[in-house]
Amino acid sequence: MAHAEEPEDRMAWIEPEVRPGSLLVSSTDLTEPAFRRTVIYMIEHNDAGSLGVIVNRPSETAVQNVLPQWSPLTAHPSALYIGGPVKRDSALCLGIARNGARIDGVAGLRRVDGKVVMVDLDSDPEVIAPLVEGIRIFAGYSGWTLGQLDSELEREDWMVISSLPSDVLTPPRVDVWARVLRRQPLPVAMLASHPIEVERN
């Protein structure tokens, strides 16, 4: 099920601290393959640690092949995304609530921030379908122990930026990393033109 993207010119600003719903956008100096040019949507950030999923790493595995009951609700492409290096044999699901949908108290849904919800993949898709515009399923997640993410932020590995709901379901033809940076004021917006392969320039 396709999700209508929000206007790209809507601003989502750099945030002073991490919270559920924040984006972690990798810096141009972060060259570790697992996180290079990644955008992570943060689901939890508390005294127990931090957890999020990479929203711009589609795999070649179709949702139909692993969780066929959820395939009709999955935004294009109907592929499993790589949420991060932790517990790659497990799955997490984010969805975008429909305008006006009353999701609080609905079994199988938990609000993360605004219209973005966590979907329990053990719940009934027929119950969830009328309430969401689309979902994205992630294999694994990105996790940090208490204080670990703070250290990475101090090293300036990540920029903390507020999200738009459309960031979660953006199709792979869109460079999410560059698009999020273009929404920022100068000079941060200029980073969006950073070459993908520096060694080629």
Curated annotation (Swiss-Prot):
It comes from the Bacteria. One of its GO terms (cellular component) is cytosol. InterPro entries: AlgH-like (IPR003774). It holds the Pfam family DUF179. HAMAP family: UPF0301. Belongs to the UPF0301 (AlgH) family. NCBIfam families: PRK00228.2-1 (NF001269), PRK00228.2-4 (NF001272). This is UPF0301 protein RER_60040. It comes from Rhodococcus erythropolis (strain PR4 / NBRC 100887).
